[in-house]
UniProtKB/Swiss-Prot annotation:
Cofactor: binding comment: Binds 1 potassium ion per subunit.
Protein name from the UniProt record: tRNA modification GTPase MnmE
Any Pfam family the entry gives: MnmE_helical
SUBUNIT field: Homodimer. Heterotetramer of two MnmE and two MnmG subunits.
Binding site for GTP: 226-231, 245-251, 270-273
Family per similarity comment: Belongs to the TRAFAC class TrmE-Era-EngA-EngB-Septin-like GTPase superfamily. TrmE GTPase family.
Binding positions (K(+)): 226, 245, 247, 250
Gene Ontology biological process terms from the UniProt entry: tRNA methylation; tRNA wobble uridine modification
Coiled coil: none
Named cofactor requirement(s): K(+)
Length: 446
């Protein structure tokens, strides 16, 4: 439970003018402050019309007051919402009057933080509030809404419950070290490990998809000069964003273009062609291209279909660190009918459009997996969630290895670390600095 005794206030509606503006109070003085503002009577979950007044009794604004009594509110505390006209000037004056009456200005995300501390939301759900607000399209909004409804958290808890049962069996085996593991539920341990690994693998796959829906995909077009990278970016973007000429080395700097592709944002980055030599400006362009690869989720390796092997040699090991790669043979319209095509690459023509639909399909597969949703549907996730799940997966694998050598103490420690990684997602185990970073990124009124 939160130990806070302060009452906080902030504008909860969107910035700018509008038909309605909302000022939100949360804390033990919320109701008292509303009464002092001029709200004659307040009943829980009833709307009351009132004139909100300043210290001299002059009317600041008129509107509706709503009281949500603790613990039946978003934050778990007494909450009052004052709904007036959407004038930033009047809303700021109303906040200032609330502060005069004993409230303090809320920090960014403090309402959601109090909801978390009071057990109204777990940490993943609290983060989903910001994701719902920031969603760029309907698919991302629905995924964030499912995370807010607890779909992601329940699946994390299911894995954690499986690990709890495993830890009980392993700890029992440690306490009765003279007994063989099989007589202490060894089969249950092995079955539990299999179940935990399966659940984790499925959850990690779906969380990576959820992260892509939330954050999009950073795809870098890489390849030798004159392979048609800029032409391909223009074809995918549907506009002439990059300069295209027949002169090798035309692209000297990086160019970013965001496109929407089946519910997620794909950021394409055109880069300078990689080759030996070149002038100082071109060499700087190649350095920037390699720097973009270090941040890439996906490398789109664009080669000239007429001589892909020579083009491949020019790239060298530049793409080795990129987790996902897609090889594209461009200019396939210039090939003779008898020319062989690499079955592992996609043949396209940025000029004629040949193969672009197949490229779109492959990009969707790389971004969102096989397209098969879980029973609960897609949910939004963040990079920290994916990293925590990967750590949990590594620790479960390590526990399996230690159990194979009957190193029970080491296996128990690995399972504990896996459990801890899952707890970081929902906030059951969280460092104070992590909470501070998460909630400080929220809107003031959230």
């Amino acid at each position: 439970m939160s130990s806070s005794t302060s009452t906080i206030v902030a504008i909860a509606s969107a910035a700018g003018t509008g038909g309605v503006g909302i000022v939100r109070l949360s804390g033990p003085q919320s109701r008292q402050i509303a009464v002092q503002l001029g709200v004659a009577r307040l009943q829980p979950r009833h709307a009351h019309y009132a004139r909100f007044r300043d210290a001299q009794g002059a009317v600041i604004d008129d509107g509706i007051a709503l009281w949500f009594n603790a613990p039946h509110s978003f934050t778990g505390e007494d909450v009052v919402e004052l709904q007036g006209h959407g004038s930033p000037v009047l809303l700021r004056q109303l906040v200032a009057r609330c502060i005069e009456l004993g409230a303090r200005q809320a920090r960014a995300g403090e309402f959601s933080e109090r909801a978390f501390l009071n057990g109204k939301l777990d940490l993943a759900q609290a983060e989903a509030i910001a994701d719902v607000i920031a969603a760029g399209d309907l698919r991302a909004a629905r995924a964030a809404r499912r995370a807010l409804d607890g779909v992601f958290s329940r699946r994390v808890d299911a894995v954690a419950h499986t690990l709890t049962r495993l830890r009980i069996h392993v700890e029992a085996a440690i306490d009765f070290a003279d007994e063989p593991l099989d007589t202490l539920g060894g089969n249950q341990v092995r079955d539990g490990l299999t179940q935990a690994r399966t659940l984790l693998a499925q959850l990690l796959r779906d969380a990576e998809r959820g992260r892509t829906l939330r954050d999009g995909l950073h795809a870098v077009l890489i390849g030798p000069p004159n392979a048609g990278k800029s032409s391909l970016l223009n074809a995918l973007a549907g506009s002439d964003r990059a300069i295209v000429t027949d002169v090798a080395g035309t692209t000297r700097d990086t160019l970013h273009e965001a496109i929407q592709l089946d519910g997620f944002e794909l950021t394409l980055v055109d880069t300078a062609g990689l080759r030996d030599g070149g002038d100082a400006i071109e060499r700087e362009g190649m350095r920037r291209a390699r720097a973009e690869l270090e941040r890439a989720d996906l490398a789109l390796v664009v080669l000239d279909a007429r001589d892909p092997q020579a083009a491949r040699a020019a790239i060298g090991d530049a793409i080795d660190a990129v987790p996902r790669q897609l090889w594209i043979h461009n200019k396939c319209d210039l090939l003779s009918d008898a020319a062989p095509l690499d079955v592992n690459a996609i043949a396209v023509s940025a000029v004629t459009g040949q193969g672009l639909e197949q490229l779109h399909i492959r990009l969707r597969e790389l971004a969102l997996g096989d397209g098969v949703e879980s029973v609960d549907g897609e949910f939004s996730a963040r990079t920290r969630h994916v990293e925590a799940l990967r750590r949990a997966e590594r620790h479960v694998d390590a526990a399996d290895l230690e159990l194979g050598f009957e190193q029970l103490e080491l296996a128990a420690e690995e399972l504990r670390l896996a459990h801890e990684a899952l707890g970081e997602i929902t906030g059951k185990i969280s460092a104070d600095d992590l909470l501070g970073k998460i909630f400080s990124s929220f809107c003031i009124g959230k």
